[in-house]
Amino acid sequence: MQRLSFETTGIPAPVRAVVNSTGPRPGTTRSCVTVAADEEAARGWLLAQPDPAAADKALLTSLASSLGVEVTVETELRFPVGGGFRVQAVGARVLPGSNAENLPLAAARMRGALTGPTKDQAEDWLVMLQAATAGGRKSEAGTAVALELYAGCLMRFPADVAKAACMKLAMTATWFPTLAEINATCEALASSRRLLAHALEQAA
């Protein structure tokens, strides 16, 4: 398969390294420095997006326009006991007619979009969240052990998702959230992208 050029595909410059990271060529290995640079490029691109939904849309548009790979998220309506409704992502699939040769590259690009924040970034967002919420449970993040746990939770999710979750909770939570609440908020924001990544990995 011929490598697509960035000049013709319109792929955002910050994720060029990640898009090409489909694995080392036979007989070669990728250095830790290269991997770190790839992750930093992906992280920077994610954090430059308006929100996780916008990042997901940009990724899907890029996959379709530059690689000929179309993926769709399957959703269902959920009706909470408290009333109202929400749209829940329940699956994803690669559409028929997608360019099979480019599926590994598409999967690599989506893997890059799962890059988590650095520990320093996660801790900075937690400090912001702590400052925005009232006392009570806020003291849970007061010790080094608690901060480590909270930061570790955020680092399991894409960088933009982790930041968006902290921003959302800062605007809606009265008390500093529990670890379970932060995890649940991140899970909801990351569900579509994780399903897309899984579908592409399976297809590739």
Question: Where are the regions that the model predicts?
Answer:
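Charged interaction scaffolds used for protein-protein
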Residues: M1-A204
